[in-house]
Amino acid sequence: MHFPLPIKAVMIDLDGTLLDTAPDLATAANMMLKELGKAELPLETIQSYIGKGIEKLVKRSLTGDLDGEPDSDLLRRAMPLYERSYEKTLYVDTRAYPGVREGLNALRAGGFRLACVTNKAEAFTLPLLRAAELLDYFDIVVSGDSLPKKKPDPMPLLHACERFEIQPHDMLLVGDSLNDAQAARAAGSHVFCVPYGYNEGRDVYELDCDAIVPSLYEATKLIQKSS
């Protein structure tokens, strides 16, 4: 593969790529656990549960297992508790990672179309991007409940390509996890990964991606706008 890659549009993951949301997600999870009379969990543990949407995060927090399935009645009680808690903690300790704003500015200046593609529900995605003053950078936002399927399924990426009227090979996804790598490969798109995100506790260097980039800004140096 030769760099810089010719690209028309860039899609960027949210949690663990644009924003370090783990502190606020963890606070909400522990508020939920406390209300349910359960022991609170360390930040590092909850951080490893992030990546497949809020329902999965709640299930993992309740069971202590990445693939755990709690009692259906418990889950039914827990979900609204978590959602109410996260509404309160949404943008308390969440911050953009170094190089994010510089990268977004460089991409905009370079003429790239931009999409945020996340597994987070729209009810939290849009307020969070707005609070972080990032929403206006994006032409489109595809949330975890925007479509019938979410990452690692390629549907959100293919949907964004259709909206941009481009082919998947003209698109780059920047993410932090196996979800992102698998979705991009299934869509036929390029993918860069950042090493500072969550990836459900796994080593990002084991992922099938085209490059590991230390920041979104550094990613901009490996692509060029194609006509």
Swiss-Prot record:
Coiled coil: none annotated. The keyword Hydrolase applies. The active site is at residue 13. GO terms for cellular component: cytosol. Its EC number is 3.1.3.18. CDD domains: HAD_PGPase. Mg(2+) binds at residues 13, 15, 176. GO terms for molecular function: metal ion binding; phosphoglycolate phosphatase activity. One of its GO terms (biological process) is carbohydrate metabolic process. Its cofactor is Mg(2+). NCBIfam families: HAD-SF-IA-v1, HAD-SF-IA-v3, PGP_bact, PRK13222.1-2. Specifically catalyzes the dephosphorylation of 2-phosphoglycolate. Is involved in the dissimilation of the intracellular 2-phosphoglycolate formed during the DNA repair of 3'-phosphoglycolate ends, a major class of DNA lesions induced by oxidative stress. This is Phosphoglycolate phosphatase. It comes from Nitrosospira multiformis (strain ATCC 25196 / NCIMB 11849 / C 71).
